[in-house]
Amino acid sequence: MHVDTLKKIIKNLVYFLLVIFFYVNQSYANERWRIDKDISKISFEVPVLFTTNVKGSFKDIDGFVQLDTKDREKNKAIFSVSINSIEINYQKYKDLLLSPIFFNASKYPLGVLDTKNFLYTNNEISKLEIELTIKNKTIKIPINLKVNQLTQDLVQIKGKLFFLRSDFNIGIGNWKNTTILKDRVELNYDIFLFRE
């Protein structure tokens, strides 16, 4: 009887160790990093003929990065901005920007950057293609970015991308013309992520 009891204990111990091993292995397979909303910034600039460029930023941003250490091609990152949180140097035109003529923020409250997947090795992300979604329209855009590992649990991602406002119907009617308010938009990001 002691032998059977000992076999049961060993069997349960082996089962317990396998479960712990599987759990620990899975927890290291995925790393999740969340955006630090207090210090991260997403800003933009649109050239204007014969006057000061339109410059602004989004105060309400969110997002995360998921690193899959087992299959590095399954890494993903998603970031969003609340269109209503836009702040610009031409403050008197803010309502116009939020209106259906430009962003139609009541119907399309978010702008989204989604990588789907990317390869990350040795703090390097080479040129990558993201999907930018504005006003329910998605376009693939190549970007370059730099990753700075500040501490073991804090990373900074910096870079810029360019898109055409005409691709997303940002500016319709008289505002569709790109003679005065140019078509090319520069989007800059300085994002800080902390490990969860």
Q: How would you describe each model-predicted region?
A:
Residues 1-2, 177:
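A general boundary/transition motif marking the beginning of the first structured unit of a protein
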Residues 2, 18, 28-31:
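Short, charged low-complexity linear motifs
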